[in-house]
């Protein structure tokens, strides 16, 4: 498993503990759905302004958001929906963008730790890479089930 974490902001310190939370969140989410560890995910840590620009560019929504996910393959609820030819050691699953600034704001708003919020946002994003969505209520509840399962397994309950 290759997890590439890039810090593209300077408002908050990204130390080893934050990187470990992100890595553990990715690994614990993927192990529910994947049989092996030959995958790669890129995680970019940004501020609100940067994610707002990405949100406007890619989704035509001119406001900040907490996370964006850019999957490479088509999944539906954790199952690959297309055949892929493996040509690299690690199969890239996609890119995740997390606004660390928004994570701090939401942790304060929801009354839990920043660590829990970062873990939640990471798990949420990985699930999006795996084809989960929360537009329909049934899909939202399924996604929420997996989010809580991973967070509880990491000891990060509300």
From Swiss-Prot:
Gene Ontology cellular component annotations, sorted alphabetically: cytoplasm
Keyword annotations: Cytoplasm, Endonuclease, Hydrolase, Metal-binding, Nuclease, Ribosome biogenesis, rRNA processing, Zinc
Cell location: Cytoplasm
Cofactor mode of binding and number, as noted: Binds 1 zinc ion.
Positions of Zn(2+) binding: 124, 128, 134
EC number: 3.1.-.-
SUPFAM superfamilies given in the database record: Metalloproteases ('zincins'), catalytic domain
Keyword rRNA processing: yes
InterPro entries: MetalPrtase_cat_dom_sf_prd, YbeY, YbeY_CS
Pfam assignment, any one: YbeY
NCBIfam families: rRNA maturation RNase YbeY
Family the UniProt entry places it in: Belongs to the endoribonuclease YbeY family.
Function field: Single strand-specific metallo-endoribonuclease involved in late-stage 70S ribosome quality control and in maturation of the 3' terminus of the 16S rRNA.
Protein name: Endoribonuclease YbeY
Organism name: Caldicellulosiruptor saccharolyticus (strain ATCC 43494 / DSM 8903 / Tp8T 6331)
Gene, per the UniProt record: ybeY
């Amino acid at each position: 498993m290759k997890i590439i974490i890039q810090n593209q902001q300077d408002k908050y310190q990204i130390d080893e503990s934050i990187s470990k939370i992100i890595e553990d969140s990715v690994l614990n989410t993927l192990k529910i759905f994947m049989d092996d560890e030959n995958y790669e995910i890129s995680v970019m840590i940004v501020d609100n302004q940067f994610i707002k620009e990405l949100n406007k560019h890619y989704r035509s929504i001119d406001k900040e958001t907490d996370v964006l996910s850019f999957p490479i393959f088509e999944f539906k609820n954790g199952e690959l929906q297309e055949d892929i030819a493996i040509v690299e050691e690690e199969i890239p699953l996609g890119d995740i963008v997390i606004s660390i600034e928004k994570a701090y704001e939401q942790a304060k708003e929801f009354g839990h730790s920043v660590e829990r919020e970062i873990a939640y946002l990471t798990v949420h994003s990985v699930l999006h890479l795996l084809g989960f969505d929360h537009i329909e209520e049934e899909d939202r509840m399924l996604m929420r089930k997996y989010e809580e399962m991973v967070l509880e397994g990491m000891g990060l309950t509300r």
